[in-house]
Amino acid sequence: MNSTLDSSPAPGLTISPTMDLVTWIYFSVTFLAMATCVGGMAGNSLVIWLLSCNGMQRSPFCVYVLNLAVADFLFLFCMASMLSLETGPLLIVNISAKIYEGMRRIKYFAYTAGLSLLTAISTQRCLSVLFPIWYKCHRPRHLSSVVSGALWALAFLMNFLASFFCVQFWHPNKHQCFKVDIVFNSLILGIFMPVMILTSTILFIRVRKNSLMQRRRPRRLYVVILTSILVFLTCSLPLGINWFLLYWVDVKRDVRLLYSCVSRFSSSLSSSANPVIYFLVGSQKSHRLQESLGAVLGRALRDEPEPEGRETPSTCTNDGV
């Protein structure tokens, strides 16, 4: 994470008069990113409320969705706070810089947690498709909760080490920071991303094959998973590249600034997209304006095949959270 210290603007940044076009693009993209963050926080807050406070029964996948919504909300909140500090008036620069650095570290924590949760979702569903009998009979009862807790702990540990060795306010150790940075980025780009891509590809092939053989639509749950992963890889991957590659590549400040802006907007879009995916996939054309949001969300996350010509029940089944 050492590479991220210089990859984005910070409070007190001054842009020279010769960068008028870059400045205009920067503020335009920043405005879009902030608007996306606000909408995404509202959507993820709704998902969190429906799954935790609305009395909805939760399946193992619902547990992952709840944790993912929390990670996305935290990421969007930190992103919006950072953008506000960059573009708003700075009354006390030192305090603003410390708040900015804190928000940035929490943002990395949320990003890592969200990435690892999506990887766990894809891996678990891939195993359920490849080994359905083993998965049904031998999966630990509280696997989803245990895995989610372990991934949050791993994300916290990784970002704590990065903060301890790399944050400028804590007298960073450049040598140790470099090692932590390599391990951190290797874990993200060398393990989580490849596993997510591999398992989601296998899942897509098997789901597509089964749908063609049985001549029926794939489960809504699989559509939700594959769409969410596709959006994440398309929109959030630029942020990971921004963290890792820009440190090794010598590029102009204008290019670095613009790429940082675009990667922020795309990652904000990714964290805001999941609630939209849930409600689009879970809605039924004949009752699109008549159903409650809880019913739509429950149908999207239901881990059962949908009978042909019949409406699918809308509650998440509680099969061992």
From Swiss-Prot:
Residues 302-321 are annotated as: Disordered. One of its GO terms (biological process) is adenylate cyclase-activating G protein-coupled receptor signaling pathway. Glycans are attached at residue 2. It is a multi-pass membrane protein. Residues 30, 94-146, 203-220, 282-321 are cytoplasmic. Signal peptide: none annotated. The keyword Transmembrane applies. Expressed in a subset of sensory neurons that includes nociceptors. Expressed in the subclass of non-peptidergic sensory neurons that are IB4(+) and VR1(-). Its main location: membrane. Pfam families: 7tm_1 (PF00001). Residues 312-321 have a biased composition (Polar residues). SUPFAM superfamilies: Family A G protein-coupled receptor-like (SSF81321). InterPro entries: GPCR_Rhodpsn, GPCR_Rhodpsn_7TM, MRGPCRD, MRGPCRFAMILY. Keywords: Cell membrane, G-protein coupled receptor, Glycoprotein, Membrane, Receptor, Transducer, Transmembrane, Transmembrane helix. It is found in: Cell membrane. One of its GO terms (molecular function) is G protein-coupled peptide receptor activity. The chain crosses the membrane at residues 9-29, 31-51, 73-93, 147-167, 182-202, 221-241, 261-281. Residues 302-311 have a biased composition (Basic and acidic residues). PROSITE patterns: G_PROTEIN_RECEP_F1_2. GO terms for cellular component: plasma membrane. May regulate nociceptor function and/or development, including the sensation or modulation of pain. Functions as a specific membrane receptor for beta-alanine. The receptor couples with G-protein G(q) and G(i). Belongs to the G-protein coupled receptor 1 family. Mas subfamily. This is Mas-related G-protein coupled receptor member D.
